[in-house]
Every structure is written in C-alpha cells, then in structure tokens.
Regions:
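ATPase nucleotide-binding head domains, primarily ABC-like/P-loop NTPase cores
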Residues: 72-73, 257, 376, 382-604
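Alpha-helical coupling/stalk and coiled-coil linker elements that connect catalytic or binding modules
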Residues: 1-432, 439-469, 491-492
C-alpha cells in the first residue's frame, strides 16, 4: 500500500502547487484590469485634451495608450483562461483523491450504453451508476468516451492485440502530466457532445462558394477597385465622394451573400470552436515521444501534407474566429466594403476543407482514441498493485491468484483464485445465500474483461486465453416484450448454444441457471445443460444452490471441479469467511435466518 500512498501524496502536491499558481493568476487579472481602466480613461482624456494639437500629439498621447489597452485586453483573456485551467486542474486532482476512496460519482457513468441484451455488460455492471465504466472513465472528448465504451462492449480476442494495448496503457500510465493536460484541454471546451459528429459531416459536405468561379471573383475585384479609387482620390484625380460611393455600393452588394454565410456560421461557427481544443491536444501529442506500437501508429495518423496536423487545425480555427468578426457591425461593414471580407473568409474556409476533408475526421478519431487510452492509463496509475496478465496463446487457459473486485474496498475485499487449465472444463460453485458466490462470479468476470481490453487486473498473478465472454447472472421479466423470467433465461442459454454450434470459443459464467421453474425440472435441465457444455468442448463457471450438481464430477472427473462458499454458525451467529473452499457446500442458512427474524419454521 506504500505505492498507493505515494500516488495520493502526488495528487495532493499537485493541488497545493496549483493553488499557488491560481493565486498568482488572480493577482495578475486584478492588476491588468486596473491598468486597463487607467489606460482607457487616460486615452479618452488625452484625446479630448490634444484633439486640436494635430495628429502627432493625438497619436502619442491618445492612440498609443489605446493600442496598449487592446494588448492588455488580450493578456486579460489569456489570464482568465489560465485561471479556468488552474481551477479545473485542482478539481480533477480532487476527483482522483475521492476516487481513491471509491467515491467516483464525479465521472460520467455511460448510462446511455446500458444494454440489457448484451453478452455481459449488464450482468457485470459495466455501465450505469456505480459501474466499472464510471470508475475508469476519465475521457474529456465525446469521441474518447465512445471509444472507451466500445472497448468494454467488444473486448479483444487476440493475444497480440491485447499485448499491444497493454504496452500503450503502461506507457501512458507513466506520464501523469500528459494525461492530465489532455483531459484538461477537453474539459475546458464548453460545446455540446454532438459537435464532433457535425464537424465530420461538414468536412465531408461539398463546397458551395469555392466551386463557383463567379463567386471567387468579387473578393479580388472589389479589393483592387477600392484601393484604386482610394489611390486616385489621394492623387486628386477623382473626388473622395466617388471613392466613398464605390465603397458604399460594395457594402450593399455584400449583403447579397449574407444570408448564406449567416446560415453557415450559425450551423458550424460555435461548433467549430472545439477545433482549438483539438489543436492543443494534437500539438501536445505531436511533441510527445511515443514508444509503444499503438501510440506510434496513432501519432503517425496526426499528419498532413505540408504542415503539422496541429497547425492545420489551428489555421481552420483562426479562419472561423475571423469570420466571427462579422458579428461586430462596424468592423464587418468596413471590411466587407473594402475587401469583401465575409465571402473571402468563407472561400478560404472551403479551400481548407477541400485540402483536409479526409484528414479532419481522422485527426478527431485519433485524439478520441488517445483520450480513451488515457482513461485506462489513469486506472493503471491509480492501482500500482494491479498486474498486467499474461495472455496465453493456446485455448483454453484461465489461472489467477488472489483476484479482487476493483469496486470493492481494498482493505475489506477477500480475494480468491481460479484455475481452469484444459478444455472442456467447468467450475461448479455451491454455497449459502450471501456467502459470496455472486460476488465471486462478478470478480472473475470483471477481471477477465479488464484483461481482454488490455487493462491491468487486481490479482497477484493471472494468465488467460481470451475467448469471448458470455454471462447470465441477472435475467429478468420483460413486461414490454410480454416475456417471462424463465423464457428470457432460456433465450440467453439458446444464444450461448447457438454461438458454440457456430464454432465460437466462449468463456461462460452462469448464476443459478433455470431459476424460473420448479426444483425437479430445474435440476434435470441443469444436469442436461452442463453435460451439453461438456460435449461442446467449452469452459466456464456455474454457481448454484443445487448441491446435487456437485455429483457431476463423478461423470467428468477431469473436467469438472467443485468449490463452495460456506456460511458458518458459531454461538448462534451466522458468519461468512468469503473464502472459496474445495468441495460441495455443507451448510445452508435460509431456515436459520428465518428463525432469527422471527419467521416460524416447522420442523418435520
């Protein structure tokens, strides 16, 4: 636990250091605000005082202070962003400290990914409140969240792919600063989750203005005519009123295009603000040395023709920000009259899109994938006692020592092992209510899933063969589908049989099969199902209250092993060790608990 304490200390130190930086940022904002006020008042006063003393005095005492005022506005904006950045940095480190104590309510739980018909995610509480996803999720981009969820929904089944992902996660787990920078940049974006999808749609949409030659002429022609008129007016060849009339005419002419440009800006202008976030995240990644196969490959995706991806994305961000100046009526009127500013900017934006149409979606996907890797890397960093399991090449193999459930308190969790070293092979677990059977099944399932997505697991040692995971732990009635509990369970078992008949390699975890029928029917069906699994050459774990299932070991002595979780009654008190033992359970606790609660139990 010493390493865990060091990690807690690291987060605390980051908070302390950042709080000092935040104090400094607030002081700078205060002094800049004060200086801006002084300069503005001074510039206005000097303009009034020196108005009649000519342009030289006016420039020296009024215009120059005003220029300095504008520069201070930019510095003010920088320090405001810096303040928000530092506040968010403190916040995410405080969140990590709470998460270390199993309070991870601050993180997105991915409830939109809950799927009752999924092969294992509902049974293992992968998504939703207090879920595995919520515990691990640190994504700060919508695409990153989608990537992370997809990895949980469809785990890897290839040894090399898992090992490559392990390398990437391990590499990022050693770089706390990079991970937090990526997260902070994403969290500071104030847009909506759908924006990235719409940006992709925009990137793939056809250009309108740039493809029409007649629309490309006005910006150049208007600029030439305007400056020619201004030059002729200065030389006295034409009157200033003619030059002014030409200018006004062009202002009116530019309004023809305003409706279409306004539609473009309304649809995409605010959404494209996220590009500055992606530009910063891309730049951060471009500057980072990558060692693992996956991260090197992702970094090569952040490329462009004649410039870096970060430069290209920042260029588009600047073009969109420049177009936003049209919201200032005075500036847009002057620029449209002089150089057809709005149309010129839209044509530049469409030119950018034509060059990078295929690049932008790829860059966004790449940053999203890195964002997802950072979540798993933070999970690895926060659990230094977790290990990366060995991935077996030959089917089927699952061995682990001291497995623990990641969501259980590390100081209270009783850890157990598992050993499946051949195919077919089933572990049958018996035991009393509340003795720990279901928790054990979920512990095995969750760690198996983590291993198959490349993440570290809570075990002293683990070796797995990555067959597809299928569970049936939490079947329920469906009123909407007019489906009984028993029929829902049968459908699940039929799904498993169909997959096995199709030749899929599965690792199956079942809890109390055929719960929706009478005892004799259930027992007969359970015997038949396990025998069918044996003949179909598959592997798994089954938990049951039916002690007679333990006799199957007599028929399959090399392929079935019995384990149990016992409830011990000592001094008229029920106790649980939660330690898995060999053999079939000997003690049951239902009648004992009923008596303790005052419910009459009639003995034969």
């Amino acid at each position: 636990m010493e390493k865990q304490e060091q990690i807690i200390t690291t987060y605390q130190q980051i908070i302390q250091k950042t709080e000092l930086e935040l104090q400094n940022a607030r002081k700078r904002i205060y002094y800049i605000s004060l200086l801006r006020l002084i300069l503005f008042v001074g510039a206005v006063a000097n303009a009034i005082i020196f108005w009649s003393d000519g342009w030289l005095c006016l420039s020296a005492f009024a215009i120059l202070p005003f220029i300095l005022f504008i520069w201070l506005v930019k510095r003010h904006n920088f320090w405001f962003y810096r303040k928000d950045f530092l506040k968010k940095k403190i916040e995410i480190n405080e969140q990590e400290l709470r998460a270390m104590q199993y309070d991870f309510s601050d993180f997105d739980d991915g409830k939109e990914f809950v799927n009752p018909s999924h092969l294992y995610t509902l049974d293992l509480d992968v998504f939703g409140e207090h879920s595995l996803f919520q515990y691990i999720n640190r994504t700060a981009t919508p695409i990153g969240k989608q990537h992370l969820a997809s990895w949980f929904n469809a785990h890897l089944e290839n040894k090399e792919a898992i090992e490559h992902r392990q390398e990437a996660i391990h590499e990022l787990s050693t770089d706390l600063e990079y991970r937090q920078q990526i997260r902070l940049l994403g969290l500071l974006y104030k847009g909506k989750p759908a924006d990235t999808t719409e940006i992709k749609e925009w990137a793939n949409s056809p250009s309108y203005y740039r493809k029409r030659t007649l629309l490309r002429i006005p910006p150049t022609a208007v600029t030439i005519i305007n400056f020619l008129c201004i030059g002729l007016a200065i030389l006295g060849i034409i009157s200033a009123s003619i030059a002014g009339g030409v200018f006004v005419g062009f202002v009116l002419f530019s309004t023809i295009f305003s409706k279409g440009i306004t539609k473009l800006q309304t649809t995409y202008g605010e959404k494209l603000q996220i590009l500055s976030t992606y530009a910063d995240q891309i730049l951060l990644t471009e500057q980072k040395e990558m060692q693992s196969h996956i991260l090197q490959k992702l970094k090569t995706e952040l490329t462009s023709q004649n410039q870096t991806a970060s430069q290209a994305v920042r260029q588009l961000s600047k073009l969109m920000n420049a177009l936003d100046q049209r919201s200032n009526l005075l500036i847009s009127t002057i620029l449209n009259g002089l150089i057809f500013w709005e149309l010129r900017q839209v044509i530049r934006i469409e030119k950018w899109k034509e060059i990078h149409a295929s690049d932008l979606p790829r860059w966004i996907e790449t940053i999203g994938e890195i964002d997802a890797y950072c979540s798993l890397a933070t999970f690895a960093y926060n659990h230094p006692d977790y290990i990366y399991p060995t991935i077996a090449a030959q089917s089927f193999h699952l061995q682990a020592e001291a497995l623990g459930h990641p969501l259980m308190d590390r100081n209270k969790c009783v850890r157990n092992g598992i050993d499946i070293e051949r195919r077919p092979f089933f572990i049958i677990i018996t035991g009393a209510n509340m003795a720990g059977k279901s928790t054990y099944l979920r512990t095995v399932g969750v760690n198996y899933l983590l291993a198959c997505i490349g993440a570290p697991v809570w075990a002293k040692r683990m070796e797995i063969y990555p067959a597809r995971l299928v569970t049936s732990l939490r079947t329920s009635d469906s009123l909407a589908d007019n489906e009984s509990y028993f029929f829902a369970e049968l459908k699940r078992l039929k799904l498993i049989i169909d997959k096995l008949e199709a030749g899929e390699e599965l690792f199956i975890i079942l809890d109390e099969i055929l719960k929706g029928t009478n005892s004799m029917d259930k027992q007969k069906g359970s015997f038949a199902l396990i025998k069918q699994f044996m003949h179909m050459n598959t592997n798994g774990i089954i938990a049951t209250h039916d002690l007679l299932l333990g006799t199957l070991v007599d028929s399959f002595p090399q392929n079935i092993r019995n384990y149990c979780f016992e409830a011990d009654i000592t001094n008229n008190e029920l106790t649980f060790s939660y330690q898995m033992r060999n053999g079939v359970a000997q003690n049951m606790n239902a009648c004992f608990l009923m008596k303790k609660m005052g419910i009459a139990v009639i003995n034969d």
